[in-house]
Design a protein with these regions (language model features):
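Small-residue-rich packing faces within the transmembrane alpha-helices of Major Facilitator Superfamily
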Residues: 62-65, 123, 240-243, 297-300
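Membrane-interface alpha-helices at helix entry/exit sites of multi-pass transporters
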Residues: 49-56, 81-85, 225-236
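Short hydrophobic/aromatic, small-residue-rich stretches within specific transmembrane helices
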Residues: 57-61, 235-239, 261-266
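Short helix-coil transition sites and intra-membrane helix breaks within transmembrane domains
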Residues: 25-35, 205-213
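Interfacial segments of multi-pass membrane proteins
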Residues: 37-52, 205, 215-230
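Juxtamembrane transmembrane-helix boundary motif
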Residues: 1-23, 42-43, 50, 71-201, ...
């Protein structure tokens, strides 16, 4: 099937299948959805316009935030003031990143090596998360996760979900310095640090055309010490804000979207998201991350090595 705006011929079934893969990985691992979307657009389907690829990547990564945000809010799994600070920084960063990328990285010959370097970095980060050192550092965080998950299960079984607010995110102090409790544990953070992080992450993610979860999640878990149970919801809300800003800015600068092409991919992403929600609990997350780290490392090399005359 010919997609005139994208300027490529592609089998709709292939688009759907790739979308399923992207949706599954993004939902089950929580990272690399935008990177995989970009690989599909550039290497599998042959899109040649870098400024078309970037917003199309980000649109595919919006499925999970759009679906997940209301659910996370209902379960009190979003640190709203944190998400707002990240989102405000993200708006500024997304405008800067997309504007610079639209002019400086408009050609594939400059965009792909940049994309590859960041992909290599992401692969190394995911590989690190598979090590015993990283898993041991997350034991205290896991305790809060397990406490909250057990309580949610108990409240659901007894029909008392209205009591969830007692153990969910509850703020004691909001401002530059913030304090909140979650699952009986207290957490503190600086709002300015969060804003600056949101800005920097959005500059990078908007310039690449990805969501930014690969940086936000490690920041909140490793630097801020937040439990993963609230990190997921907080990150998807901020990604929703920054990615939407980036997409709109690319469009305002003249980037085009092949909506027919995207429709097939989005259908696949939706299917992959649902499948991951149902079956990912039966698949060893560490093995999945190890596989993804290897795939991303290869992809990164594929885009970087041509700089020194090597093609793989």
């Amino acid at each position: 099937m010919h997609f005139a705006l994208a300027g490529v011929d592609a089998n709709p079934i292939s688009l759907i299948l790739w979308g399923i893969f992207v949706g599954y990985v993004f939902t089950s691992v929580g990272a690399a959805g935008g990177i995989l979307a970009g690989v599909g657009h550039m290497s599998l389907f042959g899109l040649k316009n870098a400024n078309m690829v970037k917003p199309m990547n980000q649109i595919l990564t919006l499925v999970s935030p759009i679906v997940g945000t209301p659910l996370y809010l209902r379960e009190k799994r979003i640190v709203v003031p944190t998400a707002i600070a990240l989102g405000l920084g993200g708006i500024v960063g997304a405008l800067i990143g997309s504007t610079l990328s639209s002019s400086l990285l408009k050609e594939m010959k400059t965009f792909q090596p940049y994309f590859g370097i960041v992909t290599l970095g992401i692969s190394l980060r995911i590989a690190y998360e598979c090590t015993a050192k990283f898993r041991n550092s997350q034991k205290s965080v896991k305790a809060a996760n397990d406490t909250f998950a057990a309580k949610v299960k108990e409240l659901k079984a007894s029909g008392k979900m209205n009591e969830l607010k007692e153990i969910g995110v509850n703020f004691k102090k909001i401002g530059i310095q913030n304090t909140f409790t979650f699952a009986g544990q207290e957490f503190n953070y600086n709002g300015i640090t969060v804003f600056i992080t949101g800005l920097l992450v959005a500059i990078l993610s908007a310039s690449l055309g990805v969501g930014g979860g690969f940086l936000l999640v490690p920041f909140m878990t490793s630097v801020m010490g937040f439990p993963m149970y609230i990190v997921e919801g907080t990150s998807v809300l901020s990604i929703l804000v920054s990615s939407s800003t980036s997409i709109l800015n690319y469009l305002s600068m003249g980037s085009a979207l092949d909506l027919q092409f995207l429709a097939f991919e989005l259908g696949g992403v939706a299917i992959g998201t649902v499948v991951a929600a149902r079956v990912s609990k039966y698949i060893n997350a560490r093995y999945m991350k190890m596989f993804l780290a290897l795939v991303l490392f290869y992809i990164g090399l594929k885009y970087v090595l041509p700089l020194v005359g090597i093609k793989i």
